[in-house]
A protein has these predicted regions:
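Short, intrinsically disordered, charge-balanced linker/junction segments flanking boundaries
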Residues: 1, 271-274
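Non-catalytic, mostly N-terminal accessory regions of nucleic-acid modification and defense proteins
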Residues: 1-183, 187-188, 253-264
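Conserved S-adenosyl-L-methionine
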Residues: 166-272
Length: 274
């Protein structure tokens, strides 16, 4: 049963990470999980784009794509130990942080660089790192039921942030955001913006209400374009992007930027939301 396997997911990772001297406390554990989950979820998206787009090209160099370094096909070829640690610290991270991104880069490609800009690998033990990667790679995100169920697990990971102290400020309880979305009753075609969106709670509650209204390809396109967010802190930004990819948004229009810095005079008609 999908759910019972998944409910043990967070605990299995926590138990492995507990043995790694580099992980200090819950916030770091969640941050460590976050970049791996992002790459796993992004890889599932890329498999989709590969199938559905002509000549899809990944922004990630081949050796750094999750499917090429993280997946362990049990042939004995998968990196582990010091070799894995060296690859993650000295190839993967520097490469993703320096991906060439400019104003013309499509959002769905640019998010890899913006997500990794301040990410860290805290783990110091390559064997434990391999174990965690294998647990994460067991997720079958191509399976609708499983990826849907994983959305709930992801929610529980975000909820843990509340008790992890420092990062709790980014998390608004789901009961609150769901209630607000139901009161607003958004309709397909309406847009919303959250200018301090944290891990994406309001946005995903809004999408939950809209998803039930999607009847056609045109609706699906409007659904995908119905939200906009800004988060100035790196860690919740990464969590938010992953959250939106899990909610079926191929182009998460959430930007890592400080809304408060943008002078009110800079806003144009186009920048207005419902």
């Amino acid at each position: 049963n999908t759910m019972s396997n998944l409910s043990g997911f967070v605990k299995r990772i926590r138990d492995i990470m507990r043995n790694d001297a580099g992980i200090n406390g819950d916030a770091q554990r969640i941050e460590q999980m976050a970049w791996m989950l992002f790459l796993k979820v992004y890889d599932a998206k890329e498999q989709d784009w590969d199938m559905n787009e002509d000549n899809y090209e990944s922004i990630i160099p081949e050796e750094c794509r999750w499917c090429n370094w993280a997946v362990d096909d049990r042939s004995g070829k998968a990196m582990t130990g010091d070799k894995l640690l060296d690859f993650v610290n000295n190839t993967l991270f520097p490469t993703l942080k320096k991906l060439p991104v400019d104003a013309s880069t499509p959002i769905k490609k640019a998010i890899v660089q913006t997500t990794f800009a301040d990410a860290n690998n805290y783990m110091k033990d390559g064997v434990l790192l391999r174990q965690v990667i294998n647990v994460i790679d067991e997720l079958d995100l191509s399976d609708y039921e499983e990826s849907h169920a994983f959305g709930d697990i992801y929610e529980s990971i975000l909820k843990e942030l509340q008790s992890a102290g420092s990062a709790g400020e980014f998390y608004t309880p789901r009961a609150v955001t769901d209630f607000m979305a139901q009161m607003i009753q958004p309709k397909i075609g309406e847009t919303m913006a959250d200018f301090a969106c944290g891990t994406g709670g309001f946005i995903t509650s809004w999408l939950k209400v809209l998803q039930k209204q999607v009847q056609s390809t045109a609706d699906a396109k409007k659904y995908g374009e119905s939200v906009y967010g800004i988060e100035k802190k790196q860690f919740p930004y990464m969590l938010c992007i992953t959250n939106l990819l899990l909610h079926g948004l191929d182009i998460p229009r959430v930007f890592h930027d400080n809304t408060l810095l943008k002078d009110v005079l800079d806003y144009t008609e186009d920048d207005q939301f419902d």
